[in-house]
Amino acid sequence: MKDVVGSPGTWSGMALRLSQCVSAGASMGAMATAYGFSNYTAFCYLIASMGLQLLWSFGLACLDVYSLKTKRDLHNPVLVSLFVVGDWVTAILSFAAASASAGVTILFERDVHFCRMYPQLSCGRYALSVVLAFITWSFIATSAVSMFWLLPSL
């Protein structure tokens, strides 16, 4: 059971963590370069959540690289328990931030038509950042489920 896809110390685990880093960084970059994002709390929360996700995933990707390089086994019950809790916490935060930002973006574009009334708002970048945040969440959810699946077998 220790050969679960995405488990720590494997190539698939490292690829999953690096995918999380790239998509979280891209989401942060898209939102940070959008005009007026700091006026809306949901967008600031998205930046903070993706920043936390980036740090968490980068740290675990570095741990995966170290494990692959030194041939160390990371399938320790204490370590995997920490990974499970961290993955689930960051997954919930990422999903909440992406959902809140998606709600504000839809409100601006479809309900109150802020994007037409105020063309200086970067509604396209808001939407791009939200899509990237949901992609990040899908990667972290995959990782959280694989860690949770691995835990009982240790």
From Swiss-Prot:
InterPro entries: CASP_dom (IPR006702), CASPL-5 (IPR045009). Residues 38-42, 99-129 are extracellular. The chain crosses the membrane at residues 15-37, 43-63, 78-98, 130-150. Keywords: Cell membrane, Glycoprotein, Membrane, Transmembrane, Transmembrane helix. It comes from the Eukaryota. GO terms for cellular component: membrane; plasma membrane. It is a multi-pass membrane protein. It is found in: Cell membrane. Glycans are attached at N39. Residues 1-14, 64-77, 151-154 are cytoplasmic. Homodimer and heterodimers. Belongs to the Casparian strip membrane proteins (CASP) family. This is CASP-like protein 5B3.
